[in-house]
Curated annotation (Swiss-Prot):
The gene is tmk. ATP binds at residues 11-18. This is Thymidylate kinase. One of its GO terms (cellular component) is cytosol. It is an enzyme of class 2 (transferase). One of its GO terms (biological process) is dTTP biosynthetic process. The keyword Kinase applies. It comes from Paraburkholderia xenovorans (strain LB400). Its EC number is 2.7.4.9. GO terms for molecular function: ATP binding; dTMP kinase activity. Belongs to the thymidylate kinase family.
């Protein structure tokens, strides 16, 4: 069986990506069902028993910037080894809520960690491995902030300033500009129906 495909959803908190994940997964399962493949849904930080334990620490405990980035990549290595790589090897498709682009956007753009440090970690952990498709949900940080304000018990990332998310968004868009062959940018200000039509188009060409 041919190797599976790896799809990631990205975007700043409040951009709406998580809202569309389950719907996208259902449509993807319909696409691959006739081939005997499955769709594995996962997330970062997390995705493994170890990752889910440390996720709580990363999201709620203040820490040194470099410690935060190192934890993200350490969890990613385990995620790749335990979940992503085995699933792709057996022909399944993997759909992840965030991956490496989030680290460049949040720890790099948002927190200001030098890009070369992140690139070194990326090469060490992933080699040349990248998603087949990254769907970036793009939204003005001010609008995203209004959406986040309704969240209960926000974590320490969701509680960041609008300026933080402006930097995070800018880094996401820079990453997308550098790799247009794998990025699809969706304007999250559109209606749910419009967004789902665009997602249907993406599924059709996978």
């Amino acid at each position: 069986m041919a190797r599976g495909k790896f799809i990631t959803f990205e975007g700043i908190d409040g951009a709406g990506k998580t809202t569309h994940l389950s719907w996208f997964r259902e449509r993807l399962e319909q696409k691959v069902a006739s081939t005997g493949r499955s769709v594995v849904m996962t997330r970062e930080p997390g995705g493994t028993p170890l990752g889910e334990q440390i996720r709580e620490i990363v999201l709620h405990q203040k820490m040194d910037l470099e410690t935060e980035a190192l934890l993200m990549f350490a969890l990613r290595r385990q995620h790749l080894a335990e979940v992503i790589e085995p699933a792709l090897a057996r022909g399944d498709w993997v759909l992840s809520d965030r991956f490496t682009d989030a680290t460049f956007a949040y720890q790099g753009g948002g927190r200001g960690l030098p890009r070369d440090k992140l690139e070194t970690l990326e090469r060490w952990v992933q080699g040349g491995f990248q998603p087949d498709l990254t769907v970036l949900f793009d939204l003005d940080p001010e609008v995203a902030s209004e959406r986040r304000s309704a969240a209960r018990d926000p974590d320490r990332f969701e509680s960041e300033s609008e300026a933080f998310f402006s930097r995070t968004r800018a880094e996401y868009l820079r990453r997308a500009e550098e790799a247009p062959y794998r990025f699809a940018i969706i304007d999250s200000a559109q209606s749910i129906a419009q967004i789902q039509r665009r997602l249907e188009e993406l599924i059709a060409i996978l």
